[in-house]
């Protein structure tokens, strides 16, 4: 009997968190109305831990040093820093650094990807602490929401969905409303959604940089009156 003829059982999600209740409108309403005190502990821990490993990734010699390469090759504007810090966190995590990371959807790389670029833009724009926490809630929930359709274990590169989520958080920080946020996500996914996961390793950092770049480009596309449609 050929292996291709063997029956394949579907994902068993019994007892796991039900994410099907999430949609972008509900996420948007939540992040704009939640008392920041209620999310400050968990988001604050993400800020502390993920910032620390990004700093270490830029200080040390890890993997291909994608974060450092980005800053050296392209300068230190906010867009480059946003990509570099997310990549640097992955440089460290994928190459032996034992510092803890606050995950998203079960993944450290995705946790760093949907938080560190948003933090860099929050610093650049000098937004209030409240706005920063709301932006991070948006990016984290947007990343989780996308995984509802992707699944918990998939050949789809999770950096892609997390990069799009970072774009959503950045759009919010820059003053974008609901339409800007959702079109940012759609545009970002149209750019890099063909990327597959080929394992957790050093090259994840470069995939993260590309995905964050797509998130930022997706937002700038919509600002300039451009967007991808079905089939594009």
Regions found by a protein language model. Give the residues of each.
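Alpha-helical support elements that line or immediately flank enzyme active sites
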Residues: 111-127, 168-175
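Conserved phosphate/anionic-ligand binding catalytic regions in large, soluble enzymes, centered on
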Residues: 97-116, 157-162
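Glycine/charged-rich beta-loop-alpha catalytic/anionic-binding loops adjacent to active sites
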Residues: 93-103, 143-153, 196-201
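Soluble metallo-hydrolase cores and metallopeptidase-like ectodomains found primarily
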Residues: 63, 72-75, 89, 93-102, ...
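Acidic-glycine-rich active-site phosphate/pyrophosphate-binding loop
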Residues: 77-96, 128-146, 186-194
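Short, small-residue-biased leader/transition segments that mark boundaries at the very start
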Residues: 2-3
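C-terminal structural cap/anchor segments
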Residues: 152-153, 157, 161-182
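Functionally critical mobile loop/hinge segments
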Residues: 10, 18-75, 81, 175-232
């Amino acid at each position: 009997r050929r292996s291709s003829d063997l029956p394949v059982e579907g994902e068993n999600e019994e007892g796991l968190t039900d994410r099907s209740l999430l949609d972008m409108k509900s996420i948007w309403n939540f992040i704009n109305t939640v008392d920041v005190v209620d999310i400050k502990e968990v988001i604050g821990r993400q800020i502390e831990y993920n910032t620390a490993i990004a700093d270490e990734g830029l200080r040390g010699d890890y993997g291909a040093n994608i974060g450092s390469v980005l800053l050296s090759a392209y300068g230190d504007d906010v867009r480059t820093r946003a990509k570099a810090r997310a990549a640097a966190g992955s440089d460290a995590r994928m190459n032996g650094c034992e510092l803890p990371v606050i995950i998203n959807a079960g993944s450290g790389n995705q946790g760093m990807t949907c938080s560190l670029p948003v933090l860099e833009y929050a610093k650049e724009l000098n937004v209030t602490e409240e706005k920063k926490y709301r932006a991070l809630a948006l990016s984290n929930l947007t990343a989780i929401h996308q995984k509802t359709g992707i699944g918990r274990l998939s050949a789809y590169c999770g950096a892609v969905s997390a990069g799009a989520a970072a774009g959503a958080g950045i759009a919010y920080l820059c003053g974008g409303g609901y339409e800007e946020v959702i079109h940012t996500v759609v545009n970002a996914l149209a750019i890099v959604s063909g990327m597959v996961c080929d394992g957790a390793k050093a090259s994840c950092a470069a995939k993260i940089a590309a995905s964050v770049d797509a998130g930022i480009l997706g937002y700038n596309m919509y600002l300039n009156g451009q967007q991808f449609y079905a089939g594009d």
